Regions:
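Residues within mature, well-folded domains
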Residues: 1-76
């Protein structure tokens, strides 16, 4: 969908960047998960009747974002 494409385009900007950039833009994560080999920042936000969840997978040694995942996030 167009909304999912927009979400992907927005989140792709963080790939290869330092994890502090995500915190500067989105604030402190709702949760931090340590799942080898990644440190995962989880951001949750309610949007109408669904909860938007974004996950950023950070390579801890270099502190760089290597991938992301997004569920139920709507960009208007």
């Amino acid at each position: 969908s167009k909304s999912q494409e927009e979400e992907k385009r927005i989140l792709e900007q963080y790939l290869g960047k330092n994890s502090s950039l995500v915190k500067d833009k989105l604030g402190e994560p709702s949760q931090i998960i340590f799942e080898s080999p990644y440190k995962i920042y989880v951001y949750k936000k309610s949007q109408m009747i669904v909860t938007c969840e974004r996950r950023f997978y950070i390579e801890p040694k270099k502190d760089l974002i290597e991938k992301f995942d997004s569920k139920n996030c709507i960009n208007k």
